[in-house]
Every structure is written in structure tokens, then in C-alpha cells.
Swiss-Prot record:
It comes from Rhizorhabdus wittichii (strain DSM 6014 / CCUG 31198 / JCM 15750 / NBRC 105917 / EY 4224 / RW1). It comes from the Bacteria. It is found in: Cytoplasm. The active site is at 332 (proton donor), 363, 473. GO terms for cellular component: cytosol. This is Glucose-6-phosphate isomerase. It catalyses: alpha-D-glucose 6-phosphate = beta-D-fructose 6-phosphate.
Length: 500
């Protein structure tokens, strides 16, 4: 038996204890499981992590080679074993191999120079930024601009990812093509949806007689030669390293629209906040390592308690896109069926991540969370300081509801009426930012990245490839080029009905 299997067996043998009993039996529970880093409070005390479980998960982490894999990540080793690449996103924050950090800083300097040129109206009087990308080339910028760019007052930014023409059409109705800069974000610069959207934006500009539309295009890519082939001048290309994965790329040139919308100082604060979480993840021991503890929680509920999903509720309208961002980060990274060595995984991997915005979600899905038969670990994310000038009652009511939901999930209530009974003993984690600003949001996103990595180490899988997304794209291309004869009757009938 391997050490990792022995550690899992020890975890399975650990008796389950209710949350109320844990608070009774562990007087120091709140102080041990509520910790702060980079202006963010993480409260794990309402999860079933006992002192004994933490010790046994720490043994699992040791048996899984966690420390060595973490060090390899920051050293720039080829931790993406299936593609023989490093995962250099920490280097974008100054936390990585010296050569990688130096290269990232060079790319950032090029970004800053481009922003200076735009602000100097080298591209003409730009008011609108239209960013087209998909997946990691869009979700990160969209989250950050939506969360932090509301009052920046610099440029109006639209992020379009869907190939559905309705998405672009909605932007065309409110943007002026004469004042629009097109940003094309694609790691390979061959992404079907992105390139089709980019061509449509150029056609829209041409229809309005924009002089030389290609001079209004900025390319963000790890394949600059492809952007040149596509017709973009080398001086309009912002490259980034091929070893920066798409869903980890918002710190790289992919973050260009964020820096443009918020200003360079804000982008640097974002990087600094993430770097603070990087340092914590590198140096903190297992019992106080926030991303690793979060991974312990994930593995406990997924593997040992059979939870198939995890719900994230942002009690802050500015973070409404956070659940969508986390869906890609977590499920594309860890939704795998084989280990890094190619052997099959013998248990569940990534849970299904979903969520919404509080208090809206309370009136939609919390019925299931409180009284349903499925175990759903819940994560609450909130900020202490509001960003609006409305009556304080708005923010107070928001936070009171957030904290009340966590208390209710844990305590439950039995009043003698089965239809009105709440079983309780339902877990939640609360993440409380002092305020939502670039630094703290950077730290929060880096926390989720490292949590995802820690989960992968405990499971023995590679979180940096995504081969599962390829087959559907290949079939879509073959439908266009080869016809439908080789497909099943259902697929052929659907294509015939919709496409003729």
C-alpha cells in the first residue's frame, strides 16, 4: 500500500462529528480556523475539519509530495507533465524562476507602453474597448473590469466571448466604431470563435469607413507570428509566455483591457495582492496554509462525504461573475479522469462549481441548501466596505443576510413540524474582504488558483492541461468540412433541421 493510500484510509477511519459538537469540543476552533491574509479573512470554522482531520490531511499532503510539487511550480519546472511545460502564471506576479520573472516584466513594460500610446491618442480618440476572446482569454478580464471598473471613468469596456452574433450586435448598438479599439485575445491566435468575432468587428468598422481598421487592433497572444499572418502589425502585438495557461492568464498580457480600464497603478496593485498570496502559499505550514486548508475542505466533502457540487455565493454585486470564473478555473483544471502518470483516478475529482449573487440566490436556490437531501458545501464571499453612497441599511442588510445564512445552515431548527424543520449541520466557509479593491481581488483570485493546485496534488492529477475540450471542437470542424454522413441519426437529424 502506498503512503497516499494509507493516508486516505486513515481519513476514512476518522469519526464524523457534528459542527455544534466541534465548537463544543474544540474551544480554540475559531482562532485556529479563522485566519487572515492580504486583507481577507477566511473562516473555515463552520466546516467539519477537526484537529484530527487536519493532521491526517497534512499527512496526505506529505505523502502526495505537496511541498515538492509546490516548489516545482514556483521554480518553473515542467509541472504540466502531459505537455512538458512549466506553469508560469506566478512569474507574472514576480514569484517564479528569475528568467521567467524577467520575461514577464518585459511583457508588462510593453503593455504599459501600449497604454501610454493609447492615452496619447496614437490610435485616435478612443472611448470604447471591445475585447474579444473566450474561456481564459475572456473570463478573467470580464470579472475584473466588471468588479473594479464601474467608476474608473477611463474607457467603456465590453468583453465578448460568445460566437452568437447577438453578443456582438448588442455592443455594436452602443459603441461608436470610429472611437473603438479592438483587442483580440487568443493564446494560439487560431481560436475559431474569437477569430470569427474579430473579423466581424473589422467588418463593422469598415462599414462605417474607419480608416485602416487593422491599425485599431491590439493582439494578445502567445503566438505573435500567427497575429502577424492575420494582418496585425508587430508593434500592435502584446505577447505572453506559452507556459501561462489560459485560465491562469489574467496576470499576463491578457490583462491588458483591465490595465487600460483601471489604470496601470491598479493593475500593479492586482499583481501585488496576488504576490502576497503566493508568498503565503509558499511559506505557511499546512495547518495555517489557507489554500491548502481550503483544499482539505474540498477533499473531505467530495471524497469522504460524497458531495458532488460546491456552491459559491458572492454577497457583493460587483463579484457577480466570480462563480462563472471559478467554474472554468476549477472544473477545467481538475475535471479529469486520469492521474498525471496516466493511471485512472479511483474516486471523484473536481466537484461541480456553481453559485450566484446574494441576496438574490436566497430566493432561488437556498431552499435546497437548507432542506434538500443533497450535501452542498457553501462558500460565502463578501466585502465589509460598500462602494456606493446609498443608505447604510443596504450594505448592512446584505451582510446580515450573508452571516445569517451560514448560521442557519449550521444550526438548523426542529420545531416539531417536518415541513418546517431544518436539519442543520450543513457546512459553509466565509471569505470576508476588508474592501473590494485591486489588491484584495488579486489575492482572492490567487487563493483560488492555489487551492485548485493543492486539490490537484492531493488527487495526483495535472491541473494545467484541458484535453477534454478538444473533441467537440474537432467534430464541429469536421461537420463544416466533411459533412454529416459519419454521425449518429440524432446528430444528422438536428443538423438537417437547423442548418439544411
Amino acid at each position: 500500500m502506498t503512503e497516499a493510500k494509507a493516508a486516505w484510509n486513515a481519513l476514512r477511519d476518522t469519526p464524523a462529528t457534528s459542527l455544534t459538537e466541534l465548537f463544543t469540543n474544540e474551544p480554540d476552533r475559531l482562532s485556529r480556523l479563522s485566519m487572515e491574509e492580504a486583507g481577507i479573512l477566511f473562516d473555515f470554522s463552520k466546516t467539519h475539519l477537526s484537529a484530527a482531520l487536519i493532521d491526517r490531511f497534512a499527512a496526505l499532503a506529505e505523502a502526495s509530495g505537496f511541498a515538492a510539487r509546490r516548489d516545482a511550480l514556483f521554480a518553473g519546472a515542467a509541472v504540466n507533465v502531459t505537455e512538458d511545460r512549466a506553469a508560469e502564471h506566478p512569474a507574472e506576479r514576480g514569484q517564479g524562476a528569475p528568467d521567467s520573472v524577467a520575461r514577464a516584466r518585459g511583457f508588462h513594460a510593453r503593455m504599459r507602453g501600449m497604454i501610454d500610446a493609447i492615452e496619447a491618442e496614437v490610435f485616435g480618440p478612443i472611448r470604447h474597448i471591445l475585447h474579444v476572446g473566450i474561456g481564459g482569454s475572456a473570463l478573467g478580464p470580464d470579472l475584473l473590469v466588471d468588479a473594479l471598473g464601474r467608476d474608473a471613468g477611463r474607457y467603456e469596456v465590453a468583453v465578448v466571448s460568445n460566437v452568437d452574433g447577438a453578443a456582438l450586435d448588442a455592443v455594436f448598438r452602443r459603441f461608436d466604431p470610429q472611437a473603438t479599439l479592438l483587442v483580440v485575445a487568443s493564446k494560439t491566435f487560431t481560436t475559431t470563435e474569437t477569430m470569427l468575432n474579430a473579423r466581424s468587428v473589422l467588418a463593422w468598422m469598415e462599414e462605417d469607413n474607419v480608416e485602416d481598421p487593422y491599425s485599431r487592433v491590439i493582439a494578445l497572444t502567445a503566438a505573435p507570428e500567427k497575429a502577424v499572418e492575420w494582418g496585425i502589425d508587430e508593434t500592435r502585438i502584446l505577447p505572453f509566455s506559452e507556459s501561462v495557461g489560459g485560465r491562469y492568464s489574467l496576470w499576463s498580457s491578457i490583462g491588458f483591457p483591465v490595465a487600460l480600464a483601471l489604470g496601470w497603478d491598479a493593475f500593479e496593485e492586482l499583481l501585488e495582492g496576488a504576490a502576497a498570496m503566493d508568498r503565503h502559499f509558499r511559506l505557511a505550514p499546512p495547518s495555517a496554509n489557507i489554500p491548502l486548508l481550503a483544499a482539505f475542505v474540498d477533499q473531505y466533502y467530495s471524497v469522504l462525504r460524497g458531495a458532488e457540487t460546491r456552491a459559491v455565493f458572492a454577497y457583493d454585486e460587483r463579484l457577480r461573475l466570480l462563480p462563472s470564473y471559478l467554474q472554468q478555473l476549477e472544473m477545467e483544471s481538475n475535471g479529469k479522469g486520469v492521474k498525471a502518470d496516466g493511471s485512472p483516478v479511483d474516486g471523484p475529482t473536481a466537484a461541480i462549481t456553481w453559485g450566484g449573487v446574494g441576496t438574490d440566490a436566497q430566493h432561488a436556490v437556498f431552499q435546497l441548501l437548507h432542506q434538500g437531501t443533497r450535501l452542498v458545501p457553501v462558500e460565502f464571499v463578501a466585502a465589509i466596505e460598500p462602494d456606493h453612497v446609498l443608505d447604510d441599511a443596504h450594505h448592512r442588510t446584505l451582510l446580515v443576510n450573508c452571516f445569517a445564512q451560514g448560521a442557519a445552515l449550521m444550526a438548523g431548527r426542529d420545531n416539531g413540524d417536518p415541513a418546517r424543520a431544518y436539519p442543520g449541520d450543513r457546512p459553509s466557509t466565509t471569505i470576508l474582504l476588508d474592501r473590494l479593491d485591486p489588491g484584495r481581488l488579486g489575492a482572492l483570485i490567487a487563493f483560488y488558483e492555489h487551492r485548485t493546485f493543492a486539490n490537484a496534488v492531493l488527487l495526483g492529477i495535472n491541473p494545467f492541461d484541458q484535453f477534454g475540450v478538444e473533441l467537440g471542437k474537432e467534430i464541429a470542424r469536421s461537420i463544416e468540412s466533411e459533412g454529416t454522413d459519419r454521425f449518429d441519426p440524432s446528430t444528422r437529424a438536428l443538423i438537417a433541421r437547423a442548418l439544411g
